[in-house]
Amino acid sequence: MSEKYPGPLVVEGKLSDAERMKRESNFLRGTIAEDLHDGLTGGFNGDNFLLIRFHGMYQQDDRDIRAERAAQKLEPRHAMMLRCRLPGGIMTPQQWLAIDKFAEENTIYGSIRLTNRQTFQYHGLLKKNVKPAHQMLHSVGLDALATANDMNRNVLCTSNPVESQLHAEAYEWAKKLSEHLLPRTRAYAEIWLDQEKVATTDEEPILGATYLPRKFKTTVVVPPQNDVDLHANDMNFVAIAENGKLVGFNLLVGGGLSIEHGNKKTYARTATEFGYIPLEHTLAVAEAVVTTQRDWGNRTDRKNAKTKYTLERVGPDVFKAEVERRAGVTFEPVRPYEFTGRGDRIGWVKGIDDKWHLTLFIENGRILDFPDKPLKTGLKEIARIHKGDFRLTANQNLIVAGVPEGDKAKIEQIARAHGLMAGVTPQRENSMACVSFPTCPLAMAEAERFLPQFIDKVDGIMAKHGLAEEHIVLRVTGCPNGCGRAMLAELGLVGKAPGRYNLHLGGNRIGTRIPRMYRENITESEILDNIDELVGRWAQEREPGEGFGDFTVRAGIIRPVLDPARDFWE
């Protein structure tokens, strides 16, 4: 203990009900298998409502028609959101064709939603289609295990198709980390894949019988790109290369963006540098971080259960020393690295392997045949002829990777014909929103449905001030849980109520600073008035190459968040 970090290693007190639920679940089985046969409700009952999250699903309903159904004395139109496990975001065209077909035939909305965690989600999956969904994924070598709830979620890896050798090595580590930290329970295989119940006792040597205190997120980052937004994550491995070859990682621990409106015990936090490790210690160190958080994380209050709060309670040095003890390693000093950006390079780039890579901008990651843009059909046509792979990015875009010179023209022709290469402004390319309404039960304000028209208006402001070729990293999240990563944007909007947002300013382009709240609970027109005034000043007063977020801090418009646990709410 110290004056700054006075907390105990373990928080004593009454455990949250989620801990009871996990303990009684028989290693995540609950009564999910029986519940699947209950046709009286479209949802899952009791603990199963939460247990299905460990199997990669959330129970949702269509909030646009919730009141109407209640008036008719009907239960909400329950449907599941299912999230695939796809470390590093790489999949084959054959896998794409399978998920495309399933979305078309078995979901209410018929869409595929790319997420900013490099995977895809189905929305509107009825209970009767849940098991077939898992079986379809399994048939093409995929699964949805551990993509939600108190486990290590989908592992991210920088999408860099140009540095092919280094990217390939980093991607292999993302896969190894994902596999190493997976739950060992056979519940997933038994319930969804009809595999035999084995008479052995389940054990969870890493995650433990009650799993982690809260969600846990991991990235592998290849500088100079910070596309994965490492500071949103609990555990980050920053690739260090010598002569283009991966030699080890800098480890950063304890990032996270989720807050609760008005709860000053919650805050966004950037990750802390622990030091450098050679490659051979990677899995041991990852396991040590996870087990330390497993044992020390707060199981009495889920709002304070993430790794960032554990670090602030016990102190980063104490946590780091425990990781060293458990892993049997001593961290070396952090090796130099720097970030220069985090957006995707839209369009064609040629890799050092002489293959071509086409990054397609997908607004909000929503893949559907829109009236003027049949994106879904276009990607299906590309998948039918493409010999390389598809890579989902942490910016909700898609890379058609590994295209030989001879196939380039044909793929471009398909992409253009289906609206996949319609040029957009730099501002639109650098804006992002979470799903929010109508499917997310936590949504307080619109996000995905709000963003396209909102960016039209922001584009108008940028053009008015002579900045049409510039951009602000702008993000909208429908609630303070932060899926849209607004808490690492230069300009972040956080949903407060229908049509109202908190406006945060002062992040930076490379995603290493938390933005501070500038205006609370304001409307779209008030937001646009603020943006107009601030962009006008930025255009007039900025220094050469100065990003919007850095300008707002230098000009004294907003104070930077320097020590979030103590100054985030000031």
Swiss-Prot record:
It comes from Cronobacter sakazakii (strain ATCC BAA-894) (Enterobacter sakazakii). Belongs to the nitrite and sulfite reductase 4Fe-4S domain family. Component of the sulfite reductase complex that catalyzes the 6-electron reduction of sulfite to sulfide. This is one of several activities required for the biosynthesis of L-cysteine from sulfate. This is Sulfite reductase [NADPH] hemoprotein beta-component. [4Fe-4S] cluster binds at residues 434, 440, 479, 483. Binds 1 siroheme per subunit. Binds 1 [4Fe-4S] cluster per subunit. The keyword Transmembrane helix does not apply. It is an enzyme of class 1 (oxidoreductase). GO terms for cellular component: sulfite reductase complex (NADPH). The keyword Signal does not apply. Siroheme binds at residue 483. PANTHER family: SULFITE REDUCTASE [NADPH] SUBUNIT BETA, SULFITE REDUCTASE [NADPH] SUBUNIT BETA-RELATED. PROSITE patterns: NIR_SIR (PS00365). Gene3D superfamilies: Sulfite Reductase Hemoprotein, domain 1. It holds the Pfam family NIR_SIR. Its cofactor is siroheme; [4Fe-4S] cluster. One of its GO terms (biological process) is hydrogen sulfide biosynthetic process. Disulfide bonds: none annotated. Alpha(8)-beta(8). The alpha component is a flavoprotein, the beta component is a hemoprotein. Keywords: 4Fe-4S, Amino-acid biosynthesis, Cysteine biosynthesis, Heme, Iron, Iron-sulfur, Metal-binding, NADP, Oxidoreductase. It catalyses: hydrogen sulfide + 3 NADP(+) + 3 H2O = sulfite + 3 NADPH + 4 H(+). GO terms for molecular function: 4 iron, 4 sulfur cluster binding; heme binding; metal ion binding; NADP binding; sulfite reductase (ferredoxin) activity; sulfite reductase (NADPH) activity.
